[in-house]
């Protein structure tokens, strides 16, 4: 997706918040399955909507004071350990160039970040503990942090989650075109399955064929595939996908 689309969204969200405001949005955290193995990463939908960044350990900060608007992305500093195990982490210059964001700093530099003491805070309420930790690191008004911690600072707390979700309900021409592309890929994958599936196959084989078509067209699954044959088709969110397809069954 082109950067101009994300910039339009950021401009739109900042126009919807009050003046003298600080908006903070956190990326989704990585989820560990066991030991050092994580589940496949899934970015926060709202964070991705405003940035296009699909990496963990990133934070978007926007401030609004009259006509003065500032946008900062906080990212992880590249290191040799990540380079060996997961591949090179992008540098702040790479983020700045790729996503066209005004300022980019590393997470170990946040104590140097000056955001003032805005009277209105916008964030997703589910991230409150992350927020308190960040505000203390960036020397934001400690009284605000204390009130937030004790849940008494209601007048300046604004839920960013609902605000961004409302924005996402209305699709731009660019988004509508992307949705059509995704629908066309899905149609092609479904037609392919109608031609190829037969009794004796396993549901997971059908799933593999479906995913193969989607990935070959540059697509990703919006949710786990539901491949349900026979009585499994009565289960609304069936995802085991491990039964054999039998004759005369749907």
Predicted regions and their residues:
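Generic, well-ordered alpha-helical scaffold segments in large soluble proteins
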Residues: 182, 189-192, 196, 209, ...
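Short catalytic-site patches enriched in acidic/histidine residues
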Residues: 35-41, 140-146, 158-163, 170, ...
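Short, glycine- and charge-enriched coil/turn segments that flank and shape catalytic ligand pockets
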Residues: 19, 198-201
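Residue-level marker of positions within ordered structural domains that often coincide
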Residues: 65, 184, 191, 215, ...
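A composition/biophysics-driven feature that prefers long, compositionally simple stretches
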Residues: 1-188
